[in-house]
């Protein structure tokens, strides 16, 4: 396998994560949906459903990625996410049931499929810069929310100019295209590959420290690190 410039992986990761930030841009649609007769609880239900499917499918994606490969999983996520928004637009953009299914369930599932890929691939291509690459990928996820809020709202005024239906349709096409393009670079490096000049760290006893020792789900749940990280996320999300 020919080893290409690994920074293309970063480009692909950022493109994918920018599109996936759509889930946190949902609030920009709330005023228009309320004007169309929705209650605040209905808008929150779609968002909560999206987060639920995002979390559940993300676990599934992590399990199937070694078998199918990261490119297929990320592109599947792009197709599912984009299709969800496209269908939401085609069904009028204001139907609660349609948006709950197409954006909450299908869109959330698409985000879950694609989310794990850039981080997993990026860390394998950059064992020497894991923190940097993970930070860049996740920051794209956060910035994507701001980008889509501004595009639909104050910058692009898509909702004001074209309405919810057209906005959902346009965003669906954009999300699908961005993730499909970014997915082109989502492949793992060759087995045993390391960047030039990088050597695996050495433990105090002289043995090489590698990333080959993996925990299964049961073993992971028994580690104190898992529970500490879970508490950190729980308190952070609550804040």
Model-predicted segments: where are they?
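Glycine-rich segments within core transmembrane alpha-helices of 12-TM secondary carriers
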Residues: 126-150
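Intracellular juxtamembrane helix-capping segments at the cytosolic ends
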Residues: 33, 111-126, 133-134
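Hydrophobic core of transmembrane alpha-helices in multi-pass small-molecule transporters
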Residues: 18, 84, 96-113, 234
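C-terminal ends and interior cores of transmembrane alpha-helices
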Residues: 79-93
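Helix-to-loop junctions at the C-terminal end of transmembrane segments
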Residues: 57-70
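Pair of pore-lining "gating" transmembrane helices in MFS-fold secondary transporters
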Residues: 3-25, 219-239
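Extracellular/periplasmic helix-loop-helix junction of adjacent transmembrane segments
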Residues: 25-58
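Helix-loop-helix hairpin linking two adjacent transmembrane segments in secondary transporters
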Residues: 141-191
């Amino acid at each position: 396998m020919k080893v290409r410039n690994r920074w293309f992986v970063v480009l692909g990761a950022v493109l994918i994560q920018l599109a996936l930030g759509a889930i946190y841009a949902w609030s920009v649609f709330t005023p228009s949906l309320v004007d169309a007769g929705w209650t605040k609880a209905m808008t929150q239900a779609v968002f909560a459903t999206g987060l639920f499917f995002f979390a559940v499918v993300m676990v599934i994606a992590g399990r199937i990625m070694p078998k199918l490969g990261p490119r297929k999983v990320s592109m599947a996520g792009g197709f599912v996410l984009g299709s969800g928004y496209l269908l939401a637009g085609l069904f009028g953009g204001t139907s609660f049931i349609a948006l709950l299914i197409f954006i909450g369930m299908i869109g959330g599932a698409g985000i879950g499929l694609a989310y794990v890929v850039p981080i997993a691939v990026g860390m394998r291509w950059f064992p020497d810069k894991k923190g940097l690459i993970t930070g860049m990928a996740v920051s794209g996820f956060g910035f994507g929310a701001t980008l889509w809020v501004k595009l639909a709202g104050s910058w692009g005024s898509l909702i004001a100019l074209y309405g919810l239906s057209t906005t959902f349709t346009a965003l669906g096409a954009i999300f699908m295209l961005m993730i499909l393009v970014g997915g082109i670079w989502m492949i793992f490096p060759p087995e045993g590959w390391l960047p030039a000049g990088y050597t695996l760290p050495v433990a105090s006893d002289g043995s090489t420290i590698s990333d080959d020792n993996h925990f299964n789900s049961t073993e992971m749940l028994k580690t104190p690190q898992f529970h500490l990280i879970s508490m950190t996320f729980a308190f952070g999300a609550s804040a």
